[in-house]
Amino acid sequence: MTLFSSISSISNPMTSSKSIIASFGSGTIMSSNSIACGSGCGGGRGGILGLGLGLGLNLFGGSRGACGGNGGSGNPAQGGNGSCCGGPCCGI
């Protein structure tokens, strides 16, 4: 899905959040892994703000981005894909 690739390249958490919500409206929810790649990179690095903008994927302490696989101690939505944010290796 190129849609998630374009979302993950956005560094502004607010802009990223809006894009992710728009993508949900077009029915592109694939799995928690692919969504984590899209939201974790752009919206997951903003601490508390990022946790909220991650649309529930980073609510388990993952403030550094789910795509990086280093979001926290108990985040079940982590993709564990290494530092692949913005790249094609998010499993989409």
UniProtKB/Swiss-Prot annotation:
Gene designation: hssl46
GO BP, sorted A to Z: sorocarp development
PANTHER family, A to Z: HSSA/B-LIKE PROTEIN 1-RELATED-RELATED (PTHR31059), HSSA_B-LIKE PROTEIN 1-RELATED (PTHR31059:SF5)
Source organism (scientific name): Dictyostelium discoideum
InterPro entries associated with the record: HssA/B-like_chaperone, HssA/B-related
Protein name from the UniProt record: HssA/B-like protein 46
Record family assignment: Belongs to the hssA/B family.
Coiled coil spans: none
